[in-house]
UniProtKB/Swiss-Prot annotation:
Induction or repression: By alkaline conditions and during infection of tomato roots.
Subcellular location, record wording: Cytoplasm; Nucleus
SMART domains: ZnF_C2H2
Naturally occurring in which organism (per UniProt): Fusarium oxysporum f. sp. lycopersici (strain 4287 / CBS 123668 / FGSC 9935 / NRRL 34936)
Gene Ontology CC terms, in alphabetical order: cytoplasm; nucleus
Coiled coil (UniProt feature): none
PTM: Activated by C-terminal proteolytic cleavage. At neutral to alkaline ambient pH, the signaling protease cleaves pacC within the conserved 24-residue signaling protease box. In an ambient pH-independent reaction, the processing protease (probably the proteasome) removes additional C-terminal residues to yield the functional form.
Domain of life (superkingdom): Eukaryota
Motif (YPX[LI] motif 2): 601-604
Protein name: pH-response transcription factor pacC/RIM101
BP GO terms, sorted: positive regulation of transcription by RNA polymerase II
Gene (UniProt): pacC
Family: Belongs to the pacC/RIM101 family.
Intervals of motif YPX[LI] motif 1: 447-450
Entry keywords, A to Z: Activator, Cytoplasm, DNA-binding, Metal-binding, Nucleus, Repeat, Repressor, Transcription, Transcription regulation, Zinc, Zinc-finger
């Protein structure tokens, strides 16, 4: 009597389903499918008879692999059945890399590929979006979908609180957040809710504390009305600052390996070009600009991590192998001093013909640093004056050779590490020796001339010809010839304007009107003026970058932020990139061979030394 029972039970349930509503039929069919689900060893006829009244949603849970037609209660069970039963494994010698779902016939080369392909046929969507709650079958599909939310907010790591990153505008989730994240770990309820009332007032647009890298700067709100711009600019600050430190380290390495000639202004300008506008490693924060323009965060000049509120947050250290030991820093400071002297020697050519305003106009009138006279620069490159938000063009800046401070010293002084023995070092008594400072009006400064001889000065300076305008350093021929050759080369095209000015004592009215109204002459003058201003800006930026690098190196030397030469790399707080394969108990090196931490370029030993 027991065999006909399974046949009567489905018939009674079919009659009940015909008289019920559509909603009840779906629920009844689900219960029916669960109650009569046969074992894997059951025949296919029983499974076909039980799945006949099923809806389209239940049809998706039927295995269509080579007419298997086995039904499963959940997508996970169906997926596991296909992977274990039909795909198989190489270890059991039954691996099948061809998809036989209906008429798919997709062939792969690895088991992982076909198991990922099976998700297309199985209604299994375990990967949910944390922003909108939408589910996806494969992780790569979720990754593509997550990129659509990038224009609304800055993405954070799934394991972190969405409010913990540097979000510009945190977006609350549109749907219920998933219980599991991408890694399968359970999440707390705090990540599924929007901004709570317990946060500080006005913090919706404010930058959030960084938990990603130690290079990120957690800027405090300066002005509540403009803090949204600060949060937006701080989002990508970590990558830019890491890139800046990499460029500085490359520059230090090239300078130590003598790939840059310290006496060649052209090579120095090319090597410093990537650092123009990107160098932001001051020892202290910028001043007098907080009320007008948001300033980027000054990067920490030490190699330690930045404090973070999350103890388990990932910290990032600043590796700089080229400036690791004290000898490296001293060597780099010496090379930077030579480069600074070379840049200063080319001030006459960089500032020749630039129309300037003297310090009496109120801009940069009083200065205490030896840096070139300039206004503060905002992150966008605009000039911000010390007394307010006032854009200043390059033409309105004071010339480094004519701007004299209140004490009588020139605005730009040479490096303190090099002592000038000739009469070409700018000083209070010799400041009138500059060709530009000897003209009375700004109109005559456009075309300066080089004197045939320099006047005698009471401090021991002798007469000098124009061919010897250059520093008298040591016996280096390359150093001595660089100044004189550059000065003679740039003085070639200057006699043409002097002929015009000398013959302009009795000009005709028609000629003067023609020269003023000619568009070709105006365009030539404007192009030449623009080129001179650009050349002056490049020279000024080179001087700023060199001074900033020297301040950084000197600051590390003063704070003793370097690795001791006698200290082993394991006991030092160096980065993983600085690991030395040599053992700390290695025998001492022979005399004449460089130790670890010394300069990177090879040292040529003289015979008999």
């Amino acid at each position: 009597m027991s065999p006909p029972a399974p046949e009567q039970k489905p018939q009674l349930q079919q009659q009940q389903q015909q008289g019920s509503s559509s909603g009840d039929s779906s629920s009844g069919s689900a219960n029916d499918s669960k109650s009569v689900t046969p074992a894997p060893s059951a025949t296919s006829n029983t499974s076909q008879s039980s799945t006949a009244p099923s809806t389209s949603s239940d049809d998706n849970l039927i295995c269509r692999w080579n007419a298997c037609n086995q039904k499963f209660p959940a997508p996970e069970a169906l997926y596991e059945h296909i992977c274990e039963r039909h795909v198989g494994r190489k270890s059991t010698n039954n691996l099948n890399l061809t998809c036989q779902w209906n008429s798919c016939r997709t062939t792969t080369v690895k088991r992982d590929h076909i198991t990922s392909h099976i998700r297309v046929h199985v209604p299994l969507k375990p990967h949910k979006c944390e922003f909108c709650g939408k589910s996806f079958k494969r992780p790569q599909d979720l990754k593509k979908h997550v990129k659509t939310h990038a224009d609304d907010s800055v993405l954070v790591r799934p394991s972190q609180d969405p409010q913990g990153g540097l979000n510009y505008r945190p977006q609350p989730p549109k749907g219920p957040s998933s219980y599991y994240d991408h890694t399968g770990q359970m999440r707390t309820n705090a990540a599924a809710f929007a901004h709570q009332a317990g946060h500080p007032s006005g913090g919706y647009y404010a930058p959030q504390p960084s938990t990603n890298y130690g290079l990120y700067f957690n800027q405090p709100p300066i002005n509540n009305a403009r803090t949204e711009h600060l949060g937006y600019s701080a989002a990508a600050g970590g990558y830019d600052r890491k890139r800046t430190y990499d460029m500085v380290d490359d520059f230090f390495g090239s300078a130590k390996r003598r790939q840059i000639d310290p006496s060649s202004y052209a090579q120095i300008g090319r090597s410093l070009m990537p650092l123009h506008g990107n160098l932001s490693v001051p020892n202290g924060p910028m001043t007098a600009t907080e009320q007008y323009m948001p300033q980027p965060a000054p990067a920490p000049v030490h190699a330690g991590p930045t404090p973070s509120k999350t103890p388990s947050a990932q910290q990032y250290y600043l590796p700089m192998p080229s400036a690791r030991t004290q000898k490296d820093l001293i060597h780099i400071d010496t090379i930077l001093g030579q480069m600074q002297d070379t840049i200063y020697e080319n001030a006459n050519h960089a500032t020749a013909g630039v129309h300037i305003h003297h310090a009496e106009n109120g801009f940069n009138g009083y200065r205490n640093t030896p840096s070139p006279p300039t206004s503060h620069r905002s992150p966008t490159g605009m000039h911000v004056g010390a007394d307010g938000y006032q854009p200043v063009s390059a033409a309105s800046m004071a010339s480094p050779l004519t701007a004299i401070s209140s004490t009588g010293t020139p605005a730009v002084t040479a490096s303190s590490s090099m002592s000038y023995t000739s009469g070409h070092s700018p000083s209070p008594s010799s400041s009138a020796m500059s060709p530009q400072s000897r003209h009375g009006s700004t109109a005559s400064v456009m075309y300066p001339t080089l004197p045939t001889s320099l006047p005698a000065v009471s401090q021991g300076f002798g007469h000098s010809a124009t061919t010897t305008l250059g520093p008298s350093f040591d016996g280096s021929e390359r150093r001595r010839y660089s100044g004189g050759m550059l000065q003679r080369a740039r003085a070639g095209p200057l006699p043409l304007p002097h002929e015009d000015t000398s013959g302009a004592s009795t000009p005709k009215a028609s000629e003067s009107a023609l020269s003023v109204g000619s568009p070709s002459s105006e365009s030539d003058v404007s192009d030449a003026t623009r080129e001179r201003e650009e050349q002056y800006d490049r020279w000024l930026e080179n001087m700023r970058v060199i001074e900033t690098l020297r301040e950084y190196v000197r600051g590390r030397l003063e704070r003793k932020e370097f690795v001791d030469d006698n200290e082993s790399p394991r006991s030092s707080h160096s980065d993983a990139m600085d690991v030395d394969p040599k053992s700390p108990q290695a025998p001492p090196r022979e005399l004449g061979t460089p130790r670890e931490g010394s300069s990177l370029y090879p040292i040529l030993r003289m015979p008999g030394a």
